[in-house]
Amino acid sequence: MSVSSRGAASPAHRTAPTKWLFTKEEMKKTASIQEGMSREEELASRQMAAAFIQEMIDGLNNVKDPKMKIGHTGLCVAHTHMHRFYYLHSFKKYDYRDVGAACVFLAGKSQECPRKLSHVISVWRERKDRKQLTTETARNEAAQIIVLLESMILQTIAFDLNVHLPHIYVLDIMKKVDKKEHYRPLTSCAYYFATDVIAVTDWSLRYSAASMSIVIIHLMAAYANVRIERLFADFINEDSPWYAKFDETMTNEKLREMEVDFLVTYRNSCQFHHASKFNFREHRPMLENPDVRKLDRTRDARSHSPMVHHVPDSTVNVRPRAYVPRDELTVERLNKERGVEEERRKRERDRMAGKLDSSTSSEKRARIDPLANNFVSSSSSSNGKLAPPPIPPQLNFPPPPIVSSGYNHKNQINRKNHENNHTNSSVSPAFVPSARTFDVAPMLTPPTAPKLQSADNSDMDLEDGELE
C-alpha cells in the first residue's frame, strides 16, 4: 500500500485498504447470516443501527458551543465502525443500540470531538429505554457496558481507526471538474448523499471510497438532469471513460451494478435518508397559516442532551420531554382520558352503593353547623339576625339625571352604532368599554362630594358599647 507524502491525516491520494473490503460471496458469510438471518434482515438491522447512531449524535449535539458538537465525519466513522463490527459479530447476540452508543463514543475520540462518558450514557439510555438513570449504581453499570463494548469494537477492528470516507473524494473530484463552482448545489447534495450511502447500505465493506464517490456523482448528475459528458468534458477521451482518472478499478458493469443495487435499497429505506432531511431543513418553505399547537410542540421537542438543564419534566412519567414520537403522544393522551373515565365510573359506583352523599344542595345546607348562620351574606334576610348595615345617605348617590334638551336629543349616542364601531375596530376587546355604560345619557352634572363630619361631631371619643 503506497502512502502519500501529504501525511497520514490526508487520505485523498492513498490506496484504500483491502482488509475491510469483501466480495459478494464473503458478504454471504457474515455472523448474522450464519446464525439464520437473511440478507434483507441483516441489512434492515444495519439501517436501524445507523439511524440510532444518528439519533444519538443529534442528542449529543444539542449544545450551544459548536466546538463540542460531533461533526459529520464523526457520524460516518461511527457508521463504518458499526458495519465492521457486525461483519464478525451477530445482531442476535449484541443489541445494535448498545453497539451504536459505543461506536459514537469511539468515533468521538478518533475524530477529535470527544464527549464525556456520562453524556453518552445519559443520551443512550434515554434513546433506548426512554428513561434516565437516577442512581449512582445504575450509572456505573451503564458506563461499564459502554467501555466493555468499546474495547470489543477496538479488538474486532484490530485498532484500525483509519477510515476512508467517500466525502473527501466527492469534494476532490468536483473541485477538479467545477473550478468556477457552477455546480455548487450539486456538490452539496452529493456530499450529504454520501452519508446515505454509508448509512443504508453495506458498501463500506464491499467497495472503496473512490468507487462510491464515482457512483454518487453519477447518480446526483442524473438526478439534477446534468449530462455527465458535459460535466466531465475535460476528462473524457476515446480510449478511457470519464471515471478512469479517478478510480482505476471502476468499469461500466460495476457502475451499472452499483447503481441498480443502491436504487433498490434506497427505495426501500426512505425513512433513513439523511440527505433529504438536510435539504428539507435547509430549504423548508414558509408556512402561510402556521398551527400554533404544532409550533409549540416542535419548540418543546428538545433533545435529551445532558448539557441542557432547562428542559421541563413530564408530568406523566417524570422524565424530560425531549423528542417524543407521535405514537407516544397519542398513548399518553389516551391513558390520561382513560384515567379520567375510570375516576368518573368509580364515583358513580360509590354513589350507587351509598358510599357517597347523594343529597341535594338544600339538604346539605340544612345540616350545616348553626354557627354558620352568624356570617353575613348578600342573600341573607334580617329575620331577627344580623343584617348588613344600610348604606349611608351621603354615599347613596341618586342616578344621573336624564337630560331631554334638544341638543342632547339630537346628539344622543347611538348604542348600536357604538357596538358596530367597536366590533369592526382593530382594538383588542380587553380594552373596549362595555356597552352598558351607554344605557343612560351621559351625566352632565358631576355628583356632589360627601360632606365630612367635623372634628367636634366625631364619634371617635365614644367608649366601647356606647351609642351616639
Curated annotation (Swiss-Prot):
Region (Disordered): 336-468
GO biological process: positive regulation of DNA-templated transcription, elongation; positive regulation of transcription by RNA polymerase II
Residue ranges with Pro residues bias: 387-402
GO molecular function, one term: cyclin-dependent protein serine/threonine kinase activator activity
Entry keyword annotation includes Cell division: no
Pfam family, one: Cyclin_N
Protein name: Cyclin-T1.1
